Regions:
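Active-site histidine-anchored catalytic micro-motif
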Residues: 1-133
Length: 133
């Protein structure tokens, strides 16, 4: 398993980590199996989504903001980031991606994203673990 550090520069962002994951499975020598990619934070998640059109990311983040507005007077959490926790629970903390013949099994337009919902932050982290078999 390898842990990667990432800095985020926006309150909400989706950072394409596909090539980091692809490189890691090659380094681990996984030919056929799967890889688990997991965020190590309660306010940042991992998702697989389109990586060809940047408007998809913009729309994705905007729609999450519509569902989970940042300022909600009824929220009790003292840090004021309840929306970030809800977004992370919706997206999920991890993804499992198949590996075939040494490469990720992703569709033409798919990429793996680290989703920041409480940034900007320094030293965010995610773990990558490949499993042969």
């Amino acid at each position: 398993m390898k842990t990667y550090m990432i800095n985020t520069n926006a309150h909400s962002a989706m950072i394409d980590i596909t090539e980091k994951v692809r490189s890691e499975i090659k380094d681990q020598g996984i030919q056929n199996g799967f890889v688990i990619v997991q965020s190590l934070h309660t306010t940042a998640g991992i998702t697989v989504n389109e990586n060809a059109d940047p408007d998809v990311v913009t729309d994705f983040l905007r729609r999450l903001d519509e569902v989970y507005p940042w300022h909600q007077e009824s929220d009790l959490h003292m840090e004021g980031n309840t929306a970030a926790h809800l977004k992370t629970s919706t997206v999920g903390p991890s993804q499992t991606i198949l590996i075939n013949e040494g490469d990720l099994v992703l569709g033409t337009w798919q990429g793996i994203y680290f989703c920041e919902f409480d940034g900007p932050r320094r030293n965010r982290s995610f773990a990558v673990k490949g499993v042969e078999g």
